[in-house]
Amino acid sequence: MDPPCSLSARFEGSFAYLTIRDRLPQILTKVIDTVHRNKNKFFEDNGEEGVEAEKKALSFFSKLRNEIQTDKPVLPLTDNQSDTELWNQYLDYQKTLLNKGETPSWFKSPWLYVECYMYRRIQEGLVLSPPISEYDVFREGKTESFFQSQPAIIALCTYLQELKNNVANLSENQKKEELSKLLQVCLWGNKCDLSISGGLDNSQKFSILSSLESFMPFILVNDMESVWAVLSGSKNLESGKELMKRVDIVLDNAGFELITDFVLADALLSLRLASEVHFHAKCMPWFVSDTTKHDFNWTIKHLQAANHKWMSKCGVNWKENLQRSCWIYHEHLFWTLPHEFCMMAQTAPDLYSELQKSDLVIFKGDLNYRKLTGDRKWEFTVPFFQALTTFHPAPLCSIRTLKADVQVGLKPGVGEQLSSNEPDWMISGKYGVVQLSTSV
């Protein structure tokens, strides 16, 4: 059976259409503003060359914004980076899906493709504007979100330290409850997505922990029991010894959400549900608030230097986890390609075989869910493993709040009822899933 058609702005009035029409130009306007405001910094760092680069980048971004708004054809990349050829091959592939004489364009091509392409074009605009090529146009928003989420970060770091101090006294059932709590914290931390708010303040200002019970009815797929079963089945029955267990987390947003991922990763080690945690981040600024290597290291460094004892204790511990290699950082170009994940084995076989070593791969956030399911018009009741088509490297769990109109694995009638009661239920971030597939 062929999978359904891709979500696309050609469906007028759809969320994809509104994203391309309104949100992407709005994000580019913010990028233009950020680059312009940093003109003096570019001058201080690079003299006149920096000012010229700023002008060149601004011109590039203004032209890009116009291309989107007027539904121009998608252009090949020209920046000779290590992924340029892959992007241009993907453009050729998109052409093969169209009728003769048609060309891929912003409002006619798959939404997943053109939205990813916009962020890669932003990167191209900087690469072609040396010496400001390394500048992260989204960094200001990410650091601001981190600082504005301080009360929630303090509450979470404090909770983690109390859990670790008490871990020896916990029964198996209590450990299961703690895992469930921290999975929920990871889920609702995923609300802090700057690409959805167009880069406006979207920080976490209160402690999520106190709200978990009231949020429970909004979890549409709750596979937390099964996640516990996957992680806790780690004893060798003959010897009673614990087996090595690897968990991978494919990261989403920097800021508060990244802290929730770190807290979960630390707790997995303390609860002896994992012996090593591998983090996968983006190798370039992406979707406004996605985590890069700089964000990853910056966050740990800022926690270490915090004047709150449990925040700084977390920072110190997490740095040690990296030094001891029980936390391992990865980045791969594939995460910033437009390909859906069922193409990973073919396009990035090295990454696919890396994920195959995992006992559980956790995919954070909406973009990962869209790529897992191919960002298609699936029926709500289609089983998750079926929507993954050929992508089954290891048991995998998606943790996302809904901010795009794709959702599978619901019980019959649930999607329809929500659609009639709350037309924006799939895009508001109010609902979430912790959705597991154990197909391998």
Curated annotation (Swiss-Prot):
Per UniProt, where does S-adenosyl-L-methionine bind? E257, D290
Entry comment on modification after translation: Automethylated.
Residues bound to Mn(2+) are D252, N253, D290
Q: Does the keyword Phosphoprotein apply?
A: no
Its GO biological process annotations read: DNA damage response; methylation
Cofactor(s) in the UniProt record: Mn(2+); Ni(2+)
Q: Which UniProt keywords apply?
A: Hydrolase, Manganese, Metal-binding, Methyltransferase, Nickel, S-adenosyl-L-methionine, Transferase
Q: Which InterPro entries match?
A: ARMT-1-like_metal-bd_sf, ARMT1, ARMT1-like_metal-bd
Reaction it catalyzes = beta-D-fructose 1-phosphate + H2O = D-fructose + phosphate; beta-D-fructose 6-phosphate = dihydroxyacetone + D-glyceraldehyde 3-phosphate; L-glutamyl-[protein] + S-adenosyl-L-methionine = [protein]-L-glutamate 5-O-methyl ester + S-adenosyl-L-homocysteine
Is Ribonucleoprotein a UniProt keyword of this protein?
A: no
Q: What is its EC number?
A: 3.1.3.-, 2.1.1.-
- Show the Pfam families listed in the entry: ARMT1-like_dom
Q: Where is this motif: Subfamily III RTxK motif?
A: 400-403
Alphabetically, the GO molecular function entries are: fructose 6-phosphate aldolase activity; fructose-1-phosphatase activity; metal ion binding; protein carboxyl O-methyltransferase activity; protein-glutamate O-methyltransferase activity; S-adenosylmethionine-dependent methyltransferase activity
Q: Where does substrate bind?
A: D252, N253, D366, L367, N368, Y369, R370, K403
PANTHER family, A to Z: DAMAGE-CONTROL PHOSPHATASE ARMT1
Q: What does this protein do?
A: Metal-dependent phosphatase that shows phosphatase activity against several substrates, including fructose-1-phosphate and fructose-6-phosphate. Its preference for fructose-1-phosphate, a strong glycating agent that causes DNA damage rather than a canonical yeast metabolite, suggests a damage-control function in hexose phosphate metabolism. Has also been shown to have O-methyltransferase activity that methylates glutamate residues of target proteins to form gamma-glutamyl methyl ester residues. Possibly methylates PCNA, suggesting it is involved in the DNA damage response.
**What's noted about domains in the record?**
Subfamily III proteins have a conserved RTxK motif about 40-50 residues from the C-terminus; the threonine may be replaced by serine or cysteine.
Q: Mind telling me what this protein is named?
A: Damage-control phosphatase ARMT1
Organism of provenance: Xenopus tropicalis
